[in-house]
Amino acid sequence: MIWLELAIIQRALIGCVLTGFLTGLIGVFVVRMRLSSIGYSMSHGAFAGAALGVAISSNPLLTSFLFSAVTALLIGPVADKARLSQDTITSIAFPLNMSLAFIFLTLSPQVGLSSEVASVLWGSVISMSNKDILFMAILCTATPTLIGFFWKELFAIMFDRRLAEADGINTRPFVYFIIFLIGIVITLSLKLVGGLLIFALLFNTASTVLQFLQEMRKIIIVSPIVGAITCVSGLITSLAFDIPVGSCIVLVSTLIFAMSVLLSPKRKRREVKEPN
């Protein structure tokens, strides 16, 4: 196919593989540690930051990272210090970030739904730069290394946080670490998938793999692979039908998840156990 020879498409293809790898990996922790509401708030925090970057004609990646960091602080250490539940903080942070995002986009000097504004909302094939690819490649190397280094503690927390604490593990630093990691992954994936859709990719891939596998080590290995395949499939669909890449990636991931639920061995076992 001719479009595969274009440098823009090649960057997008590499970006899809790296994005799918990262979201598939971090998504396991989001699902298993029950951080779905936190991931949702983090994604919209990054979205608000990117919108601010567009409004002030600054680097959306930088402002997105700053907003993600602030949101992570509010959800993690600040919530604990104030003795507020994470659900309370995320319930406040989500509408606040969405409100700020649309205010910033309204104040944007660009006319109408420009390409930069559209990429913040829905993602864009042409928005990936060599610098973005480099950052994602570094994160793809650093993240599995850090997870492997702290695997014993993280596995215990994923299994049961209270039991991990009873076993003498200080769980808070590790939960904060995962929250900040979620923010970084979302920030770097924002250009490709878009701020309104990135959370679906975090949740769908891991949930799909969990329909078939139970051993955590296998899940950690398979989920990034499924994520990469999903993103590449979404990119190809986007190019074939000329529709936003982020929407296609999320649509493909949702269809794969729906199929996994129908074909899941867990579902079949439940049907066998149910009395007639």
Residue ranges and their predicted role:
Residues S129-T205:
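Helix-loop-helix "hairpin" substructures at the membrane interface of multi-pass membrane proteins
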Residues M1-F21, E271-P275:
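Membrane-interfacial amphipathic/re-entrant helices at transmembrane-helix boundaries
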Residues K191-S247:
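Transmembrane alpha-helical segments in multi-pass inner-membrane proteins
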Residues A12-G15, P60-L66, D87-S91, A137, ...:
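Loop-to-transmembrane alpha-helix initiation sites
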Residues I9-R11, T90-G148:
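Transmembrane helix-bundle core of multi-pass membrane transporters
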Residues G45-A55, A93-L105, G123, S127, ...:
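Small-residue-rich segments of transmembrane alpha-helices in multi-pass membrane proteins
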Residues I243-N276:
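Cytosolic-side transmembrane-helix boundaries in multi-pass membrane proteins
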Residues V28-V111, V209-I221, S238-F241, P265:
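Short loop segments and helix-boundary regions at transmembrane helix junctions
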